[in-house]
Amino acid sequence: MATLIDNRYGKARVRVLRVFKGPNEYHKVFDFDCRVLLRGAEFSETYLTGDNSKVVATDTMKNTVYVIAQKEEFKSLEEYGILLGKHFLATYSWVNGVEVVMRENQWRRIKTSNGKEQAHSFQRDREIHSVTVTSSRDKSPVVVSGIDDLLIMKTTQSGFEGFHRDKYTSLKETKDRVFATVVTANWTYNTLSVDYSKVFEQFKLSVFDIFAQTYSRSVQETLFLIAKDVISKVPQVEQVHLSLPNKHAFGFDFSRLNIENNQTVFQPVEEPSGLIEGTIKRSHSRL
């Protein structure tokens, strides 16, 4: 005997560039990759018997992504994901759940020699804005925002001392080292009344403030302080998950060449690398 215990299906890698055109050719762009997955008990028939009568074609789903993008007004991809999930639930009564996953390329306005940001010319940043919106019938949508590929580095104000040592330990303690990492993070909300774009920018500010302005005794400490700062400054954020790989840059060994090492030349090492992760949740006081 074989039993189908779960199923979902949809369309992936739907590429969208949405341009909102305001007065005086002031444009706002959303450049993103979208994946839509549908759930529903009645979809089991297509797996078990080949009956496709309830199957919403993935081509239909792809077209819907573009139609809703043009039809609806939205200020963030989080809002767009909520609208898209609402559409599928309202249109197809047998759909019980919708998951919309998006990865947005970040474009900032070009600043020209006159010091002004241009209304419709953009330069792409490295980091990615990630969004997952899960919509279920008779429940509020669950929104998870995130960031990927935010590469940061500082060349001092970081150390690593006092760690456990045993017979397999070769790492030397240091009060001063290069600290580089690629920030991957996501966060959940305790409400849907959120300025999602503002929260995204605040998250980056918290990363920059903690990373640049505090001495790091460990990647773990820096991770916690970033999440703590976000939670303290954004009351709508309920939980933060961070992943920080330690992108090592070791001092080059000049001793082999009988040259003094003045700690200004380093050798970046891509792998292996440390990987530090943590999830921090808002504490609620008990009365």
Curated annotation (Swiss-Prot):
Pathway the protein contributes to: Purine metabolism; urate degradation; (S)-allantoin from urate: step 1/3
Enzyme class name: oxidoreductase
A GO biological process held by the record: purine nucleobase catabolic process
Cellular component GO terms, alphabetical: peroxisome; phagocytic vesicle
Catalytic residues of the enzyme: K11, T58, H248
Gene3D superfamilies: Urate Oxidase
Keyword Oxidoreductase among UniProt keywords: yes
GO molecular function: urate oxidase activity
Catalyzed reaction equations: urate + O2 + H2O = 5-hydroxyisourate + H2O2
Binding site for urate: T58, D59, F160, R177, V219, Q220, N246
Similarity annotation: Belongs to the uricase family.
PANTHER family registered for this protein in UniProt: URICASE (PTHR42874:SF1)
NCBIfam families per record: urate_oxi
This protein's name: Uricase
Species the sequence originates in: Dictyostelium discoideum (Social amoeba)
Name of the encoding gene: uox
